[in-house]
Amino acid sequence: MTAPHTAYDFDAPGLDGSLQPLSQWRGKVLLIVNVASKCGFTPQYAGLEQLWRDYGDKGLVVLGFPCDQFGHQEPGEADEIRNFCSLTYDVTFPMFAKVEVNGAGAHPLWKWLKAEKGGLLGIDAIKWNFTKFLVGRDGKPLKRYAPTDKPESLVRDIEAALA
C-alpha cells in the first residue's frame, strides 16, 4: 500500500460500525474533530452543528471522531454517543466510532493529520478533546486548531477554504 497523500485516502468505522471511506467526501472541505460527551468543551457540538448547517450545502463536511483518551470523557458505547449527540445537541453531521488519536493505537488518519499539521512548539500529540483540523478540497490539511478555539472562530478560514 502506498503512503496516504490526502485525507480521502483513509476510512474509518461509523457509529453504526459500517466502514466509511473519506473518499465519499472527495472535493469537499473537511473539519475533522476529536469529540467527547463529558468534556468542558462538549458544548462545542452546538457550534460544530451550526457550521455543518450553515456551510454544508456550500461544501463543508464536519466529521466527529469520539475519543476516550482524555480524562475518560467519552465512556459511552456507540448507541450512547449517538443518542447523546442527537438528543442534547441535535447533531446531524457524520460521526464515527470511537478512536484513539495518540499513541501506538492511534487511528492512521489521526497519525497522518498530526504529522501534516503539528501542534504548538513542534509537539504533534493531540492535547485534549475538540482539537480540530481543517482540510481543503484537495484533501490536504490547511490548519490545526486548539480545543479552546470555538467553532464560530473558524468561519473566516472555512469560507476561504470553500471559495
Stretches with model-predicted labels:
Residues 1-163:
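Chalcogenol-based redox active-site neighborhoods
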